[in-house]
């Protein structure tokens, strides 16, 4: 079996793999408008509203990617009793994703990231501003306790656990311990993508930070210095006690670190002239986790995540990748 055949067989094994996703669930809102003129009130554009689109964002985007890749995601999280919370539930339902692990809470506002995109008629719209609306979940949140109870009582077979932390307050230390203990009891991989608190997540199978998150966590600057990158990778392995660290590096590709192995540097798949990076990290961890759940080694999972990341950044807005697209990318890669 060639390397390509092996990777394709892993993609084929995605189907039906059940991945529990413990996540901050975010509504990604895209507001599109046509430029009409400059305002007389301030030096800003006046837009005529064309459309508003709401998509599954944050950890919900990882859930969506697992679904489109052929897996069976089990989302666990909290939304508000508000319009965006209802919209997220509806979007999950429309995609055939059960939301029995998603709880709502009065007084909590569903996190929303609103992006305003502007352009002339019949032209590609460009993002001009983003407005984030969220307040962290309360420390004694009843909905968080409900998530923990549901997690402890879950009896379904699960092949992997994905933790997505966007800093919205769901993932306190107790809930993280519950997730790690759940994965260990089931003897399945558990991965994490944390925007602001990477060093808080010890005992995971793997972490998938981007390079700026590594720099922020360790208080260093990597730039294009491979030696600094490799030193950072080794430091994270030691401090987090994990089996793999996958660092995403934008146009420089990815780097995988495992204890006792030489670093694996993976060049970017496709072009470095991207259309939109929104949610690319969600696609990467979804693919990486699903591959581990399907029996891939960390190196194989990283290769597949690199393909998926290269595909999704060529799409506009928060997007997903399918198993067919992933298999086609493997077959079409002339570098291998």
Model feature map: region roles:
Residues 239-243, 269-333:
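Conserved post-catalytic alpha-helical subdomain immediately downstream of the catalytic base
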């Amino acid at each position: 079996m060639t390397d390509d055949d092996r990777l394709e067989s892993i993609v084929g094994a995605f189907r039906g793999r059940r991945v529990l996703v413990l996540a901050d669930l975010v509504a990604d809102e895209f507001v599109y408008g046509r430029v009409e003129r400059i305002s007389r009130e301030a030096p800003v554009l006046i837009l005529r509203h064309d459309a508003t689109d709401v998509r599954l964002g944050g950890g919900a985007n990882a859930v969506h990617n697992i679904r489109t890749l052929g897996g069976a995601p089990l989302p666990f999280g909290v939304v508000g009793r508000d319009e965006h919370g209802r919209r997220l539930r509806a979007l999950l339902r429309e995609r055939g994703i059960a939301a029995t692990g998603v709880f709502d809470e009065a007084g909590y506002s569903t996190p929303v990231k609103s992006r305003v995109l502007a352009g002339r008629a019949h032209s590609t719209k460009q993002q001009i501003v983003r407005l984030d609306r969220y307040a962290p979940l309360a420390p004694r949140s009843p909905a968080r306790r409900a998530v923990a109870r549901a997690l402890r009582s879950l009896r379904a077979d699960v092949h992997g656990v994905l933790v997505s932390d966007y800093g919205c307050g769901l993932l306190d230390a107790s809930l993280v311990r519950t997730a790690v203990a759940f994965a260990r009891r089931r003897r399945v991989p558990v991965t994490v993508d944390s925007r602001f608190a990477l060093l808080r997540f010890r005992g995971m199978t793997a972490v998938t930070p981007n390079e700026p998150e590594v720099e922020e966590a360790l208080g260093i600057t990597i730039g294009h210095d491979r030696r600094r990158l490799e030193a950072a990778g080794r430091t994270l392995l030691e401090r987090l006690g994990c089996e793999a660290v996958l660092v995403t590096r934008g146009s420089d590709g990815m780097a995988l670190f495992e204890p006792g192995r030489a670093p694996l540097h993976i060049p970017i798949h496709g072009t470095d002239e991207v259309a939109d990076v929104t949610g690319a990290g969600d696609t990467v961890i979804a693919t990486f986790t699903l591959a581990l759940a399907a029996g891939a080694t960390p190196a194989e999972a990283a290769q597949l995540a690199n393909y998926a990341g290269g595909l999704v950044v060529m799409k506009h807005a928060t997007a997903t990748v399918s198993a067919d697209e992933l298999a086609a990318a493997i077959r079409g890669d002339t570098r291998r």
